[in-house]
A protein has these predicted regions:
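A conserved acidic beta->alpha catalytic loop
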Residues: 21, 36-45, 115
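Acidic helix N-cap motif at the loop->helix transition within catalytic regions
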Residues: 16, 39-49, 94
Length: 233
């Protein structure tokens, strides 16, 4: 069974397109769990209008925290395989098939993505290239984070080891990816399985800057390493 976890907040513009792209790839026994963080637009009514029994909507933490919102969704996941999805992207038709093939031999798989504008016009052919993604535990912990949630799928053992999220981690995907890398195994694949929308108000994805100061970035890394060590103590 597959559980797709989506965190939503005021995502009315793109949520139907995203959910439609996911449902087409799921079996009748799979599920989509939507944790909504108090949307004030038509996000919930749009999801309800899809009228598919595989979709389950739960109330999020209402703290405007993507990390806590995803944690709420993951707590409700029943599947043996967990996929993370953002509310505004689009899954390519072969995403589930390709990821499931790799998950037979690896505990976590991370794919590449094509970066587009809000209308799905191509901006960059590879998110990997922009973010300087590569395989390697130390590299992804210390130097560059290569774990992007919407590009990740993992087995239930990774979910169980990751939960509950430590309160001082930088983001959910960074934490999950590092847990998978140090406790289990991770495979980065070159397949571009997501159309990754980059909006004017989203964080820069040019690989050359951050909304966080150097001190904050250092603190995030120290916190991540500390909690990884605690997993083995």
């Amino acid at each position: 069974m597959i559980s797709v976890c989506i965190a939503t907040y005021n995502g009315e513009r793109f949520i139907r397109e995203q959910i439609d792209s996911i449902l087409r790839q799921l079996s009748s026994d799979d599920e989509i769990i939507v944790s909504d963080d108090g949307s004030t637009d038509d996000t919930i009514s749009i999801i309800n209008s899809i009228d598919d029994k595989r979709i389950r909507i739960i109330e999020g933490p209402r703290k405007h925290s993507p990390t806590q919102n995803f944690e709420c969704a993951m707590k409700e996941a029943k599947g043996d395989y967990i996929f993370l999805a953002d509310q505004d992207d689009v899954w390519k038709p072969n995403k589930v098939e390709v990821c499931m093939k790799w998950l037979q031999n690896y505990d976590c798989v991370v794919s590449d993505a094509e970066v587009t504008d809000s209308n799905l016009n191509p901006l960059y052919p590879s998110l990997y290239a922009i973010m300087q993604v590569r395989q390697g535990r130390i590299y992804n912990t210390i130097w560059k984070n290569g774990y992007t949630g919407c590009c990740m799928a993992f087995r239930r053992n990774v979910l169980n080891a990751s939960m509950p999220f430590p309160k001082d981690i930088p983001m959910h995907d960074i934490w999950i990816g590092n847990v998978a890398a140090y406790k289990y195994n991770v495979k980065f694949i070159s397949d571009k399985l997501v159309l990754f929308r980059r909006h004017e108000d989203t964080i820069s994805c040019n690989g050359k800057g951050s909304r966080f100061s150097l001190w904050q970035q250092l603190k995030f890394r120290i916190n991540t390493i500390y909690h990884i060590i605690k997993l083995f103590v």
